[in-house]
């Protein structure tokens, strides 16, 4: 069976463990272990979600950058030079 261990030997070991620790401690141990596994799964899920959000943001930036028209800086230069002329007149 399991490397030479029979079902009866496993039941005897389980009985001894229950006698030593008691069912309450084993129940607490099981719930603690279950809570740890649940916490681990949620942490992994959060990391996956952050990774997916980062990829979506990067894809959105790339799509936004490629759809953007080039800025016309010549109109800004004329507006600022006109403002300089007005301040010099005063």
Curated annotation (Swiss-Prot):
Transmembrane segments: 1-21
Sample GO molecular function, one term: protein transmembrane transporter activity
Keyword Transport: yes
Entries under InterPro entries matching the protein: TatA/B/E (IPR003369), TatA/E (IPR006312)
Region (Disordered): 42-90
Keywords, alphabetical: Cell inner membrane, Cell membrane, Membrane, Protein transport, Translocation, Transmembrane, Transmembrane helix, Transport
Job of this protein: Part of the twin-arginine translocation (Tat) system that transports large folded proteins containing a characteristic twin-arginine motif in their signal peptide across membranes. TatA could form the protein-conducting channel of the Tat system.
Family indicated by similarity: Belongs to the TatA/E family.
Protein name from the UniProt record: Sec-independent protein translocase protein TatA
Lineage of producing organism: Bacteria, Pseudomonadati, Pseudomonadota, Gammaproteobacteria, Oceanospirillales
Gene name per UniProt: tatA
């Amino acid at each position: 069976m399991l490397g030479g261990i029979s079902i009866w030997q496993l039941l005897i070991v389980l009985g001894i463990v229950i006698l030593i620790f008691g069912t309450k401690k084993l129940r607490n141990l099981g719930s603690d272990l279950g809570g740890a596994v649940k916490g681990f799964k949620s942490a992994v899920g959060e990391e996956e979600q952050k990774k997916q959000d980062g990829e979506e943001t990067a894809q959105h930036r790339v799509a936004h950058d490629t759809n953007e028209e080039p800025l016309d800086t010549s109109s800004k230069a004329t507006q600022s030079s006109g403002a300089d002329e007005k301040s010099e007149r005063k």
